[in-house]
Every structure is written in C-alpha cells, then in structure tokens.
Amino acid sequence: MPEEKVATKKIKLSALCELCNGRKAVMKRPKNLQKLCKECFYNVFETEIHNTIADANLFQPGDKVAIGASGGKDSTVLASVLKTLNERYDYRLELVLLSIDEGIKGYRDDSLATVKRNQAQYNMALEIISYKDLYNWSMDEIVSCAGIRSSCTYCGVLRRQALDRGAAKLGINHVVTGHNADDMAETVLMNLLRGDTARLEKSCTILTQSTGSPIKRSKPFKYSYQKEIVLYAHYKKLDYFSTECSYAPEAFRGTARELLKSLEAIRPSCIMDIIYSGEHLALAPKKKRTQQYKNKKKTQVDNEHEINADGSITIGTREFKDGNRCENCGYLTSNKICKACVLLAGLEMNRAKVSVDNNTAVDGAAKLTKTLEQLSF
C-alpha cells in the first residue's frame, strides 16, 4: 500500500519537546510551530478533538454514530481517534463504519479493502452502500455518459444522499465525517470565488441537520490540520489508503486547495483565519443587497424542475423551504424534486443539454458542472 508523504520539515534531532522537555521532538505543528515528541503530539491532537466535541456538544450518551469511512487517512484517523476518545472519556457511543461504493474501478474497490481491514482492527460493524444498488448507476457509468468534468458534481450529490440512506437503514441518526480544517477553509474559498453567498454563510458549521430529518452530520476534525492528521496516521502506523480518486483532478476544489497552499506559505495561520472569517460571515439584510442582484432574482423562474421530451431539463431557482419531500423518491429537499433525481433523470434520458432559467439551452455535457455550480438547490 503506497504511503503518503509526511509534509513536514525535518527539525534538529537535538531539539527537545516543548511540552515535556524530556523527549526529542519529532515534528513541528503547522498551526503554532510548536515542537513536540510523538507522545505529546498524540495527547495534544486527541485532546483538541475531544474539546471540539465537548464544546459543540456533538454527542449524547447512548448515541449510535456512523463514521463515514472511505479508507482514506481522514476517515481512518477519525475512526481510530473516536474509538480512543469513546473509551477514554466514556462517551458511551455505539460506533459503526458506513462506506459508500461509488463504483470507481481501480480506486474504490481497493479503498474498500482497507475499510474492511479497519473493521477488524477497530472491532466495528460495517455497512457498505453502493451507487449501483441505490441509483442503478456507477460513477464510471456516469462519467462515461456525462463527462469527467461533471463527476464531482454528481458524486457529491449522490454520496450525501447515500450516506443518509445508509444511516436510515441502520437506524442511526448521526453521521460523522473526516472533513478537516483544510477542507473547511477550501470550502470557504470555493464559495467565495463562486459568489455563492448562501453556502458561504454555512461553510463552517460543525453540526448540520435538515429540517424534518432525524439525521445529524458533524465534523469533529473541523479544527484539525490535514498535515497533523497525516502525521498521526504515520506515527501510529494506521492502515489507510492514500491514492487520490481518479476523477478528482478535474474538481474545482483542487484550485482552492492550491490557492490555500500558496496562502499558507506566506501566512501559516491562514487556515484558521479563513475558518474564523467563515464562522462570522452573515448575509446582509435583503434591503441592503445591490439592485443588480435584486433584478437578477426577479428574472429567475420558479424552482420547478421539468424533464423535457428531448432529454433536456428546465431548472428554476425560486427558493423552497427546507424540509420538503421529493415528489419522486421522498428524500428531503428544499425543492419539489431533489437534486439527485434531477441528475439521474437527465442521465436516464442520455441528455446532452440543460435548459436553465429562461429556457436558454446549454449544449455539451462538459458544461454541466459549471451550470450546476451556479444553481442553489
């Protein structure tokens, strides 16, 4: 199994841990440049995550919690740390692994083998939900039909719904994911660059729950740096899968990630600074918004998704209240038809164009991602 490179500069072996002053330091923390030995790093890393959980009151005794497990470093470390904290602090949680098989040959099949080993290593139950069983489409088939540029748009929507359906199948009302501080900062940047103010306001929420849904989602790694997660996995010799998804290079998130790396080289605290900014962002009252934005809103059609005879889809953008049920599948949505059903309907009709707002046609599957990124569902 390929091992991910540990992205830290070597420090002098003569340097002592700045906490215990007794053991040699082996790493320098990216968030505060503190030099630590392995033992002190483990303790600090785990304690900070416990404090995040306690401060946000994420869990209650007796909760059954599903860990979104991909086999990657984030979810593997999350499973390991939650097992440790559950025993150390007596959370009294029932932890299970919930994995999604998107159907990406040469990637997901290998990573699921890692998840199955984690199941035995952490003595947790495992449930695997596949796109093919749930939607009758694998990601490889979707990419073949809609193009690689659309892959992350489809996968993000379908994966989120698959996790919820998997949790419901297991009778679980809380799903935790391995989204870390870097992911949170990237999301803020992505929404800022897109001008997506609605999502920008919610980019840094640690606990989310749709109106009418019993399933909560939380991110215990919200303040944990990706570099430290990699170091923890490396020093603990955890079993994880480190190959990137074959479709990921086409994702817009990669652009935000490169921008974040450049910013971090200039200002090491930028990740936490961006998260702090995201936490305190709030939309201005409607009366203060620009006239241009108001005029744009007036030209938008009702949010009724219509599948046309030629395979195109007319997508409106009038807001519906959170908590509606999709008329097709019954899944919670803020619209009449959920986003997953809209995407799947287009695939079933092998569409090559999408009608947006005033029925203007957008030709070519390669433009689908750009179109969907501009819509608020």
Curated annotation (Swiss-Prot):
PROSITE patterns assigned to the protein according to its UniProt record, in alphabetical order: UPF0021
E.C. code? 2.7.7.-
Q: Report the subcellular localization.
A: Cytoplasm
Gene3D superfamilies, sorted:
HUPs (3.40.50.620)
- Its GO biological process terms? protein urmylation; tRNA thio-modification; tRNA wobble position uridine thiolation; tRNA wobble uridine modification
Q: Which GO terms describe its molecular function?
A: nucleotidyltransferase activity; tRNA binding; tRNA-uridine 2-sulfurtransferase activity
| Keywords, sorted A to Z | Cytoplasm, RNA-binding, Transferase, tRNA processing, tRNA-binding
| InterPro entries, sorted | CTU1-like_ATP-bd, CTU1_C, Ncs6/Tuc1/Ctu1, Rossmann-like_a/b/a_fold, TilS/TtcA_N, tRNA_thiolation_TtcA_Ctu1, UPF0021_CS
Query: What is the role of this chain?
Result: Plays a central role in 2-thiolation of mcm(5)S(2)U at tRNA wobble positions of tRNA(Lys), tRNA(Glu) and tRNA(Gln). Directly binds tRNAs and probably acts by catalyzing adenylation of tRNAs, an intermediate required for 2-thiolation. It is unclear whether it acts as a sulfurtransferase that transfers sulfur from thiocarboxylated URM1 onto the uridine of tRNAs at wobble position. Prior mcm(5) tRNA modification by the elongator complex is required for 2-thiolation. May also be involved in protein urmylation.
State what protein this is by name: Cytoplasmic tRNA 2-thiolation protein 1
**What organism does the UniProt record list as the source?**
Debaryomyces hansenii (strain ATCC 36239 / CBS 767 / BCRC 21394 / JCM 1990 / NBRC 0083 / IGC 2968) (Yeast)
State the taxonomy lineage.
Eukaryota, Fungi, Dikarya, Ascomycota, Saccharomycotina
Its gene name is: NCS6
